[in-house]
């Protein structure tokens, strides 16, 4: 019986915590991160400030949790790409998935990349980087696979990490422009995005 009660309590806690995060995202969507305060969040979610602190340590922790949830959703989007595709095609597909996520979730996307949240310190080994579980690690493993298969050509000063950085910068730049400065601009962006990403992948390929 105690186990059943505990399970119900845990489910209720998770539901309430998610409701608070949803309310926080609504405030951020309407007025930006600066408008988020424990008082405003309490009014929106029908919790007292003290009640909110039962779930989160403060505003910064709430913003970090919203960002983490956004990153999880971005990663899930990228995982939909078929890893059995030829590696250049797979790299293209995960890039398109990244852009699509930004277009479908602009509030999450902008918050994730405009609010600085604490990051782990200390350098990770290449193997640790490849074993991670995030959108960047999906990209990193795709580049590693391309190098291992002899499709992508690593060069002095432009190896795995540099290739992954260049790929991320390319796709992120496209996504950010489309949800900010170029939102609503009359242009066939899908065609332009396709050409940009395919040309980038070709630039990584060896001459063999």
Language-model features: where?
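Helix-turn-helix
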Residues: 19, 27-61, 65
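N-terminal intrinsically disordered/low-complexity leader segments
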Residues: 1-15, 208
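Short alpha-helical functional segments enriched in proximate histidine and acidic residues
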Residues: 27, 73, 77, 81, ...
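Hydrophobic/aromatic-rich alpha-helical bundle segments in the mid-to-C-terminal region
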Residues: 109-110, 121-129, 148-197, 208
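An amphipathic alpha-helix signature
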Residues: 92, 96, 136-144, 161-164, ...
């Amino acid at each position: 019986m105690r186990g059943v009660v505990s399970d119900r309590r845990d489910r209720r806690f998770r539901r309430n915590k998610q409701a608070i995060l949803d309310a926080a995202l609504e405030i951020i969507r309407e007025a930006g991160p600066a408008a988020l305060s424990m008082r405003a969040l309490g009014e929106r979610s029908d919790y007292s400030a003290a009640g909110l602190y039962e779930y989160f340590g403060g505003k910064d922790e709430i913003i970090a949790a919203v960002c983490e949830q956004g990153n999880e959703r971005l990663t899930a989007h990228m995982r939909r790409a078929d890893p059995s595709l030829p590696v250049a095609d797979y790299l293209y597909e995960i890039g398109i998935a990244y852009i699509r996520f930004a277009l479908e979730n602009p509030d999450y996307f902008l918050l994730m990349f405009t609010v600085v949240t604490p990051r782990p310190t200390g350098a990770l080994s290449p193997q640790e980087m490849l074993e991670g579980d995030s959108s960047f690690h999906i990209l990193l493993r795709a580049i590693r696979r391309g190098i291992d298969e002899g499709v992508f050509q690593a060069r002095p000063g432009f190896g795995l990490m540099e290739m992954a950085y260049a790929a991320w910068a390319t796709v992120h730049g496209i996504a950010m422009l489309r949800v900010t400065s170029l939102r609503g601009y009359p242009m066939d962006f899908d065609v332009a995005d396709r050409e940009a990403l395919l040309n980038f992948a070709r630039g990584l390929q060896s001459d063999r």
